[in-house]
Each structure stands twice: as structure tokens, then as C-alpha cells.
Amino acid sequence: MPNILKNRDTTGAFALIDSLVRHGVKHIFGYPGGAILPIYDELYAWEKEGFIEHILVRHEQGAAHASDGYARSTGNVGVCFATSGPGATNLVTGIATAHMDSVPMVIITGQVGRSFIGTDAFQEVDIFGITLPIVKHSYVVRETKEMGKIVAESFFIAKYGRPGPVLIDIPKDVGLEKFDYQIVNPNNINLAGCPVLKNYDQNRISQAANLIKQSSQPLLYIGGGAVTSNSHNEINELINLVKIPVATTLMGKGIIDESHPLSLGMLGMHGTVYANYAVSECDLLIALGARFDDRVTGKLDEFACHAQVIHVDIDPAEIGKNRTPQIGIVGEIKDFVRDLIECLKNDINFDSEQSQAWRSRIIRWRKEYPLLVPKNINNLSPQEVIHEISTEATNAYFTTDVGQHQMWAAQFIKTSQKRWITSAGLGTMGYGLPAAIGVQIAHPNEQVICISGDASFQMNIQELGTVSQYGLPIKIFIINNKWQGMVRQWQQAFYGERYSHSNMEKGAPNFTKVAEAFGLRSLKIKSRNDLKLRIKEALDYDGPILVDIQVIADENCYPMVAPGKSNAQMMGINS
């Protein structure tokens, strides 16, 4: 350790930063303030010595989303800082986003001094209580000597089993207090009460294999848990062995190469026709790391209603929560799939050709109901734009905001595991840009693309300042239809075309000038003649760039499963 750090007082703040470094933390996203200043003062010395880097965002919500994007793209724990009061409450949406999508994060907030807690002191907020429903665990550090242990436990909890966010609230005087700091080994954490992560044996594997052998119309249903488990290789081996079609959720996107003949793309509300038909007609549904949420299932009692279900998840609370399976497996998806493959390989009675007629039927659906890229004579369609971006950008990381553009991106962008970063469960507008910042910090030599809408982008537009300050070469594409597009679509379809406060044209900023005000390069695309050339120009540019793309205002995102309808009852398709 350099002398500048050896000679520092071992305060609570020192213990915190030292513990973070020992846990391999390289980057922190945050915004300083009064209650957390002792920690920022300590951070100053550690940054100066190159141990760690802090990324200054322009709003605490941006810090939460950036650490979220960092975590999703690396598989490591994302870390963010904020001060007490409004600084802490500004994190709440980002914490909830991570909680809904099972993202490992450690959130560190400043708090008023211990003697002031409960007195309504300046910038005092009970962030511990506020966030209880949206974290895996929370701590208030009341004893400075507990700092190292609390940090170690927080990292363990954030990653153990089903990942999620953990909050550490640190009173100001704890950060300042000197004490005899005892280093806690990050590898020596063993918390009592942690649930067993496996409930199956070889007999359960054999039962699952028997269901596969009996099935003539099987389907794999892959969720975000499969991505988190790093089971890409095992799942692809299973797909090729069984010759089983696979549909993914929004979070499961990337687990299989979407050009694979057995890939059906996304299922659910805006899924492909053939994925939704397949789940409606299958006789066996194997759900891996998926939670049967409403946006996937449509009318729940008609979801995979002809199928027996095998449900595998690391979280026992998910098994049977929305759909009772014939076989419920709690365990690591990677381990289960590996065991299942071994069982099937050793079974001389297993024949993948028994589902040949089923695969042929799906091929016919694909030909009959392809995803279409409409080309309007006078104006650009959003689908055309996103398809062109996907065609030009190879092996990029993609982040999105939330709305129509998110669904079109999910339909048309072909990407791989952990290169698709989006807010799925909470559906957080304003997520895309700060998440892209986190991804770019984590992968400085990779191309990072943020696809946003004109409404979503304005939610966290201030983070252009962070992009500018750190020279992050993010490519930002705004699909600009001058509407809250998904809201308008629902108002058109279900609310008698009463467009209550969903039009964004009046007061809309000139995005290219806003970008330029932050010192960033910008482009505007209005016609098809410019589309391919300008997109390539943006992607080839070696710095940050914002591209404002004017698209058809009233284009709707189809297919669409209306609320209360089954997945087989889709709007916007030719029947």
C-alpha cells in the first residue's frame, strides 16, 4: 500500500474504501453531498493513487442506473454513492429497477450523524425504511467497527442466489470516527440462514428427461435468470441435442444466437407471432430462469394451456408463484441443464426426431408471419431505422429506454448474452443513457449504443454532461416521433383515441443543439436517403455522438397481445 494510504487514519470512511477495493471495485458512480463528504474526502486519496475511479453523474438516479448497467454487462457488483435526504431518495427508482431485474448492486448512502437520527435533522430521510421492499437487504452502520464486515456481507448477499441490490446507510460521524480497523477477508463470508440453492437429485433429472422423451411439441422458455447464471453454453448444447425451439423474455434475449433456426425471438405482449403461437400450442414448456410475468403470459390460464411445465429457478419463491409446474426445480440453471444433458445422452430411447413435425409447423409460421420492416414512401419507419442500426453495428452493447422503441429494438436487434441491457420488470423511462454510461465505463474499448425515444430521453438528458466530461464514445440514437409512443398507442387502441397529455411536440427540445451545448457532436436524419450513410457515420465516429432520427409519428408496435387476451390473440397481424 502506498505511503499516502499507510499514513492515513483508519476511520470508518477508510474502512469503507479499503473494503471496496479489496472486493475488486474499480469504479463507483455517484454524487457528493454533506452527509457523505467524509467518504468522498477519503476517496480523494485512493483515487489519486489509482486504486479506484469515481464517475460523477449529474443526478443520483443516473448513478443508480449507471452502476446497474455496469453490473449487467460485467456480472460484477455495481456500486453507487449518494448523500442523505434528497440524494438518497433520488436513487429509489434506480434501486427498484435493479430489484425487479435481479441486478447485483451495493448502494452506499450518507446519513445524518447518529445522535441526530430521528430528530428530523437537515437532509434526514429514513432511506433504510423507504427501500426495504426493493432491496435484498439493508444496513445502517451504527458501530464503526462493523464497517468491513457489513461491506463483505453486502457483496456476498448481492451476488448470492438470485442477485439484487443491497443498501448500506452510513451516518456522517461513522465515516469520521477513528477505530482499530480489522480487515475482513471477502472470501470468508458464510452467513447463517442463507437458503440451500438446490432441491433436486438424479431422480428429478430423470423425471424431467422422461417428460422430454414423451413430448412431441416441446418449447424452451428462457428468462433473465439464465443469462445471470452464465449458462449460455449449456443451454445451447441442450437446444442442439433436443432440437427444441426456444423463445426468450425481454431479459432472456441474447442467450441464443437469434439467427439460429430454432430461435423464435421474444414471446409475450410484443413477441413474435411464431413464438406466441408456439407457446400456445406446445405440449411441454421448459422454463429456465423465467417468472411467468403478465407481459409474457397474457391471459394466465390460457398460457401454455396444453403443456406440462418444468420450471427451474434459483429462487424458490418463483416456483409455482404464477403457474404450478409438473416439475419444480430449485437450483443453478447451469448445473441443472448440464445434468439433464448427461441424462439424455445416456438414454438410448431418446430421439430428438420425434418433434420434427412440430419444428416444420413452426417454420411455416415463421414464413407466414415474419417481423415486417415497413417502408413508408415519404417518412422513415422506426422499424426500418432500428433494423438498419442493427445491420450496421456488429457485436455492440445495446442499452434502451422504455416504450415502443424498446420493443422494436427487442424485435429487430440481434445481440448476444449480456450485450442487451434494458429495464424490463419496472419499465423505467430514462434508464438507457445512464446505463450506457455504466456499460461504456466497464468496457472502454467496446462499442456501446443507446437507443432511446424522444420522451424517454428527456427523463435523464442531463447525463449528457457525464458523457461529455469523461469523453465516453457512446452512440445515442433517438427515435423521435414527438409522442410518448406506447402511451399514444394504448390511447388509440383502448381509450377511444383520447390522447390525454401524450403528445410531446410542443416544448420539445432541439436534441442536436442540446448535445452541442454539452460539447457533443450531433446529427439529424429526416429521410431515407440519409439513413444508411448517417448511421454508418455515427457508428464510425470515435467519440460520443447523438443522432436525432425523425420517424413516422403514429406507427404502432405490433404484434401486440391486448390486456386480458391470450398470446394466440394478437393485434396487428394478418389472420
UniProtKB/Swiss-Prot annotation:
One of its GO terms (cellular component) is chloroplast. Pathway: Amino-acid biosynthesis; L-isoleucine biosynthesis; L-isoleucine from 2-oxobutanoate: step 1/4; Amino-acid biosynthesis; L-valine biosynthesis; L-valine from pyruvate: step 1/4. SUPFAM superfamilies: DHS-like NAD/FAD-binding domain, Thiamin diphosphate-binding fold (THDP-binding). PROSITE patterns: TPP_ENZYMES (PS00187). One of its GO terms (biological process) is L-valine biosynthetic process. FAD binds at residues 162, 270-291, 313-332. Thiamine diphosphate binds at residue 60. The keyword Metal-binding applies. Gene3D superfamilies: 3.40.50.970, TPP-binding domain (3.40.50.1220). Its cofactor is Mg(2+); thiamine diphosphate. Residues 404-483 are annotated as: Thiamine pyrophosphate binding. Mg(2+) binds at residues 454, 481. Binds 1 Mg(2+) ion per subunit. It is found in: Plastid, Chloroplast. It catalyses: 2 pyruvate + H(+) = (2S)-2-acetolactate + CO2. Its EC number is 2.2.1.6. Dimer of large and small chains. This is Acetolactate synthase large subunit. It comes from Guillardia theta (Cryptophyte).
